[in-house]
């Protein structure tokens, strides 16, 4: 898979404070790449560096294999790093005409981008009449002028109500299906898990882990091997617990009273567990493969509290 953005040993200091400490990772083309971390972890600083708003103290970054961010390259990137300054008394269409003029884009693109964000029917409505979600969709429409291949968003759902959050998340998935590579910073675990294909977790300027969302979810707390979480139950739950502790590949067994939660190596399938128990004379009444949440994995990695 080709890479649209490659970061190599990025460092950024603010006096004695290390905002970013030796950050390196690649963003695959066609991905929705989430940069996840608590507030103050360095996410916005990192986006500012790759967009040439801030200068790193050390390290390099490459857009499509070219070092730095030239003006020509930036034309291929739609960026929303802060709330755009739309005029409340003007319509959506007129606001986008101003944005198009500033960017040197054709007015003919305006109905196209409004259609993409599902605002074409409200193009003549004043910005002041828009809901929070609609305002953010208009901001994203502005980033789509010029039909960029890459979109960069900083906390795209920040401050929105639940309806607005759902609108923006679905829009990002739609844009990705249309071939856009999306890079987004977020402190919201649920958002990254539902929207992103890849994630880099940053804490206090340090890259803790990076990979596909599924790889990060499946990795063990020690990052030595991928693990599965399975719930099992049987009439003889005490006997079940005893035999499972003897099965190679079982990492831990927790008895909740009504069922057992086991953590196992990914190589140990649920069918092999079922067969093993049957051969030991225990028939399972429940065997459920549980999906590990990104919140749980985040806490394992950072040892801290999550921002939901």
Put a short name on every predicted segment.
Residues 1-11, 304-308:
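ABC-family P-loop ATPase nucleotide-binding domain
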Residues 264-308:
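C-terminal coupling/interaction segments
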Residues 67-68, 104, 207, 234-235, ...:
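Short, surface-exposed acidic/glycine-rich loop or hinge patches that mediate macromolecular interfaces
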Residues 5, 12-184, 189-203, 207-209:
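ABC transporter nucleotide-binding domains
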Residues 64, 101-104, 217-222, 249, ...:
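A generic structural signal for secondary-structure junctions
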Residues 170-264:
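ABC transporter nucleotide-binding domain
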């Amino acid at each position: 898979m080709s890479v649209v953005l490659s970061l190599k040993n990025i460092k950024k200091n603010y006096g004695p404070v290390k905002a970013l400490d030796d950050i390196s990772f690649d963003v695959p083309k066609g991905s929705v790449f989430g940069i996840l971390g608590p507030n103050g972890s360095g996410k916005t600083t990192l986006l500012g560096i790759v967009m040439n708003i801030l200068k790193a103290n050390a390290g390099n970054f490459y857009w499509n294999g070219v070092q730095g961010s030239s003006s020509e390259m930036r034309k291929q990137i739609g960026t929303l790093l802060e709330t755009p300054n739309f005029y409340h008394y003007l319509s959506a269409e007129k606001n986008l005409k101003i944005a198009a003029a500033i960017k040197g884009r054709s007015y003919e693109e305006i109905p196209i981008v409004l259609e993409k964000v599902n605002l074409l029917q409200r193009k003549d409505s004043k910005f002041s009449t828009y809901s929070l979600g609609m305002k953010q969709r208009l901001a994203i429409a502005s980033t789509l002028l010029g039909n960029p291949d890459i979109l960069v968003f900083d906390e795209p759902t920040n401050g929105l109500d639940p309806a607005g959050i759902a609108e923006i998340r679905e829009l990002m998935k739609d844009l990705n299906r249309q071939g856009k590579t999306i890079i987004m910073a977020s402190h919201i675990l649920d958002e990254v898990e539902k929207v992103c294909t890849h994630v880099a977790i940053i804490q206090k300027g340090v890259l803790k882990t990076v990979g596909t969302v599924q790889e990060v979810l499946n990795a063990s707390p020690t990052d030595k091997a991928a693990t599965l979480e399975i719930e099992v139950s049987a009439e003889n739950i005490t006997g079940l617990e005893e035999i499972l502790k003897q099965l190679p590949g079982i990492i831990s067994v927790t008895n909740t009273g009504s069922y057992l939660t086991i953590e196992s190596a990914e190589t140990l399938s649920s069918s092999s567990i079922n067969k093993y128990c049957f051969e030991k004379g225990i028939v399972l009444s429940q065997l459920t493969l549980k999906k590990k949440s990104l919140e749980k994995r985040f806490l394992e990695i950072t040892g801290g509290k999550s921002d939901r």
